[in-house]
C-alpha cells in the first residue's frame, strides 16, 4: 500500500481542476497542464483538496495511485509557483549565452555546443557561468537540466564541468608517485 497515495493534494487559491472522465486539467496563474489518469485510479475533489484512490486493492492499483498523486501535486505546484533549476559552469573559459530558446555553451570543446530548450522551459544567464532554467513542468525542466549537464558532467579530480548549484561533487586525490 502506497503511503504517498493516501495523502490528499492541496489546491491553493487560484488553482482550478477540471475533470472530464479520466482526463484532468489543472489551471493556474502560470499556465495549464493536463494529464490522463490511469484506469486503476479514481479522483475526487472535496473542497480545496484532490483525493486519489485505487479502483481495486491490488498492488498495481496502489502503485499507479501513488504515481498519479505525485504527478498531480507537481502540476499544482507548477501552475501556481513554477519550478526552477540552477546550473553552474566551473572551468577556465566555460561560458553560456542564451538567445531566445537556444543556449550556446563553450565548455572546452573545439566548437560551441548549442542546446535548443524544449517548449515550456525558459532560461536566463545572470552571469556567464550561471544558467537558471524555469518551467511549470517539473519533468521537462529536469530533463533539460540533465541534458545540459550531460554535455560536460563535473569530473572528480578538479571539479570542472557543468553542475547543479546544489550538487556536491565528490573529489578524488591525484595518483601519488
Swiss-Prot record:
* Pfam families registered for this protein in UniProt: Ribosomal_L6
What residue spans carry the region label Disordered?
Answer: 151-177
What are the TM regions of this chain, as residue ranges? Answer: none
GO MF entries: rRNA binding; structural constituent of ribosome
Please list the GO biological process terms of this entry.
cytoplasmic translation
Q: Where is the composition biased (Basic and acidic residues)?
A: 155-177
Q: Which GO terms describe its cellular component?
A: cytosolic large ribosomal subunit
Q: What family does the entry list?
A: Belongs to the universal ribosomal protein uL6 family.
* Assembly behavior: Part of the 50S ribosomal subunit.
**Classification via PANTHER family:** 60S/50S RIBOSOMAL PROTEIN L6/L9, LARGE RIBOSOMAL SUBUNIT PROTEIN UL6M
Q: What is this protein called?
A: Large ribosomal subunit protein uL6
